[in-house]
């Protein structure tokens, strides 16, 4: 599969699926500032921090879809405990970041 998407999607997937919840909560804003500065330093027309934050809040839904799809497959793709934990972590990230509300605001 090939897709094209903004880099913040990958950031959101990583932070909300692979990073421990408490660490993500404590560090995500600083990490996003570093990400934005890295884009600027590389000569990329980076979005303003508040726009990047809004995009991040929406981007985490991709990770939630991946986690819930994996969990729904039972143990066919990976041990069920792994899939269920990933789903819990991703669901918490969406709740923390008010992802549904972020989509409402965008629409």
Give short role names for the model-derived ranges.
Residues 2-43, 60-79:
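Active-site activation/catalytic loop segments of kinase-like enzymes and analogous catalytic loops
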Residues 10, 51, 98-102:
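Exposed alpha-helical structural elements
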Residues 13, 37, 54, 58, ...:
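Charged/polar, solvent-exposed surface patches and flexible loops
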Residues 26-29, 50-54, 81-84, 88:
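Generic alpha-helical secondary structure signal
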Residues 44-59:
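All-alpha amphipathic helical-bundle segments outside canonical DNA-binding/catalytic cores
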Residues 63-107:
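ATP/Mg2+ or Mg2+-diphosphate-binding catalytic cores
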């Amino acid at each position: 599969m090939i897709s094209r998407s903004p880099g913040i999607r990958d950031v959101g997937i990583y932070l909300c699926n692979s990073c421990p919840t408490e660490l993500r909560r404590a560090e995500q804003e600083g990490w996003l500032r570093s990400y934005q500065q890295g884009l600027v330093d590389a000569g990329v027309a980076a979005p303003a921090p508040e726009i990047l934050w809004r995009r991040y809040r929406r981007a985490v839904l991709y990770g939630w879809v991946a986690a819930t799809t994996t969990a729904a497959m039972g143990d066919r793709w990976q041990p069920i405990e792994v899939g269920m934990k990933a789903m819990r972590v991703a669901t918490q990230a969406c709740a923390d970041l008010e992802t549904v509300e972020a989509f409402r605001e965008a629409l």
